[in-house]
């Protein structure tokens, strides 16, 4: 009986040892696999980090080559979104009673009475009557006077049939307008009437009836020939 008990104990102990070895081997395998996975993960992380560094350096180089100013958005730390209620589409605001605004009447300002401007009256100067030259009758030449002038026959005939024309009476100075005090005083200048000019005798009518007279200095000069015989 003791031997059986010892054999059972030894078998149990061996079985336990085998189980322990199995568990230890499994643990070692799991640890080794975990280590391998950890190393693999670390390698992947290192590769990713290297790739990111390369991309960052390339991006920096491109930014240095192409530099464009970009507008920076202003960010305020103290600002917060304003909450507002979301109203339904069929929502209508409440009706408010109509308020009557008082009608403002414009104030009528009293217009100050302006003083009437007193205009000084202008003193009228008396009219200066212009003296009128009395009409002098034109003296008509008689036949005896014409004969004494020793004029040619055609000229005498034209003078005999010529009717003497009276000279129209005109005032010496036209009426002057009223002069104000602000204007300068102008003294009237007396004007003499110009007599009516008589018709001049043409030279061509006189030349045929003149005879040349010898002159030692100037030469020959025509002398009028008498038409009427002179009574001695």
UniProtKB/Swiss-Prot annotation:
Phosphoserine modified-residue sites: 30, 32-34
| Signal peptide location | 1-15
What's the protein called, per UniProt? Beta-casein
Q: What does this protein do?
A: Important role in determination of the surface properties of the casein micelles.
Q: Which UniProt keywords apply?
A: Milk protein, Phosphoprotein, Secreted, Signal
**Family matches, as Pfam families:** Casein
Q: What family, per the record?
A: Belongs to the beta-casein family.
Q: In which tissues is it expressed?
A: Mammary gland specific. Secreted in milk.
**Protein localization:** Secreted
Source species taxonomy: Eukaryota, Metazoa, Chordata, Craniata, Vertebrata
Q: What InterPro entries does UniProt report for this protein, alphabetically?
A: Casein, Casein_beta
Top-rank taxon, per record: Eukaryota
| GO cellular component terms listed in the entry, alphabetical order | extracellular space
């Amino acid at each position: 009986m003791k031997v059986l008990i010892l054999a059972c104990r030894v078998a149990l102990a061996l079985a336990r040892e085998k189980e322990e070895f199995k568990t230890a081997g499994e643990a070692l395998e799991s640890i080794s696999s975990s280590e391998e996975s950890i190393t693999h993960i670390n390698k992947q992380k290192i590769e990713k980090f290297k790739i990111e560094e390369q991309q960052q350096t390339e991006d920096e180089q491109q930014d240095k080559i192409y530099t464009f100013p970009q507008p920076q958005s202003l960010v305020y730390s103290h600002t917060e979104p304003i909450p507002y209620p979301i109203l339904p589409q069929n929502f209508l605001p409440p009706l408010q009673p109509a308020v009557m605004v008082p009608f403002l009447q414009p104030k009528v300002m009293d217009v100050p009475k302006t003083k009437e401007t007193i205009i000084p009256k202008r003193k009228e100067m008396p009219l200066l009557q212009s003296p009128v030259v009395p009409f002098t009758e034109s003296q008509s030449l008689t036949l005896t006077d014409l004969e004494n002038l020793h004029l040619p026959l055609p000229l005498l005939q034209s003078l005999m049939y010529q009717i003497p024309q009276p000279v129209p009476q005109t005032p010496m100075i036209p009426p002057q307008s009223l002069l104000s005090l602000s204007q300068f005083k102008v003294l009237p200048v007396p004007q003499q009437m110009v007599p009516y000019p008589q018709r001049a005798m043409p030279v061509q009518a006189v030349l045929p009836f003149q005879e040349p007279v010898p002159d030692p200095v100037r030469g020959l000069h025509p002398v009028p020939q008498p038409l009427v015989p002179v009574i001695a």
